[in-house]
Amino acid sequence: SKKLKVLMSGGGTGGHIFPAVAIAQEIQKRFPDAEFLFMGANGKMEMEKVPQAGFKIEGLNIAGFDRGNLLANVNLPFKVISSLLKARKIIKEFQPDFAVGTGGFASGPALFIAARMGIPTFIQEQNSLPGKTNIFNAKKAKKVFTAYPNMEKFFHGTKTLFLGNPIRKNIITDIIDSDINKEKLGLEKGKLTILSVGG
């Protein structure tokens, strides 16, 4: 039988990368023979984090719009064109069954080209205020999975499905083994532990 092939794209920050990894891990759990290919931005953290999670990644020479330094955007149109062409070549060779985008500028060309090539695309939005890339790609997406309810106004209504944020398997394991983790931190087992984060 034919192997399931999945294209994943998202990056720039951990907020885009780690949900993509979590989705890939869950698909892998359900379809152990599935093949994955991530598409990210060269020089960004996904180029390191995705291989660490055990997945293959291809880099695009893409960057976001720099609002602070307008001169830095001079090469942006060329970067977009070269990224679209490279994304097309990668997708043509890999031939995914579907593509999942989690936002960040790298997922723009990847999902745009996938949709143009007739490949079903899906979006996962982690934020209550969606990013521009996900809003743009949602127009052609089959479904948009959101972390928060009532996101229809951003994503053409019927396309949205509120599922919450995906969590990586090592995080779930750490939560289940909370007593072991308390021991590592020198805390007492069985006692309620509160973590306070600010800043």
Predicted feature locations:
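Nucleotide-sugar donor-binding and catalytic loop/hinge architecture
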Residues: 1-4, 176-194
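Short amphipathic alpha-helix
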Residues: 16-27
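Glycosyltransferases and closely related glycan-assembly transferases
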Residues: 86-99, 107-122, 135-143
